[in-house]
């Protein structure tokens, strides 16, 4: 990535993923040294900028977003900031299913980025399965949360060993 960025004269922003128990992607949350060393590596790569740290909840492994796992994620980032003397701009705490904490006014202070797709397109809060206000269909019951909205083709860029059982309070998976 660095070589190609330099070749193209570009700066690629990278969101380093930390797996907080959902088994989706990223470095396993208990592997602090590996997380820190990867941040150091990114900081030293020409043409690459650490955009922030990211995680996912309630996707592959059905681990619910909670105040605790959000704060644990932030603690990893703050420890890295202190240890390396850097500022991490973004703490991206999940996908559409993390919105439930915002909806319930429980979003941990310091989480400042959220990656949403279906929530934006359909207005569905996927944990409690209800439409958000201000959508034209917000008074209707949510009957189904599956759609052919996106098709994704990608190559595998990460292979790692992780536990086979998710860690945290479980909910429904993202493959309704």
Predicted regions, residues:
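Active-site anion/phosphate-binding pocket segments in diverse small-molecule metabolic enzymes
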Residues: 68-176
């Amino acid at each position: 990535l660095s070589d190609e960025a330099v070749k193209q004269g570009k700066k690629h922003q990278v969101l380093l993923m930390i797996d907080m128990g959902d088994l989706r992607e990223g470095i396993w949350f208990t592997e602090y040294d590996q997380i820190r060393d990867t941040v150091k590596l990114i900081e030293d790569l020409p043409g690459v900028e650490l955009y922030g740290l990211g995680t996912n909840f309630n996707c592959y492994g059905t681990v619910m977003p909670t105040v605790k796992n959000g704060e644990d994620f932030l603690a990893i980032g703050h420890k890295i900031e202190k240890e390396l003397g850097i500022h991490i701009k973004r703490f991206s705490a999940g996908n559409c299913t993390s919105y439930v904490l915002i909806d319930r006014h429980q979003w941990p202070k310091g989480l400042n980025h959220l990656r949403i797709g279906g929530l934006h397109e359909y207005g569905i809060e996927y944990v409690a399965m209800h439409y958000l206000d201000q959508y034209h269909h917000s008074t209707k019951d949510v009957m189904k949360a599956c759609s052919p909205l996106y098709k994704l083709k990608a190559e595998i860029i990460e292979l790692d060993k992780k536990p086979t059982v998710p860690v945290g309070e479980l909910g429904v998976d993202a493959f309704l």
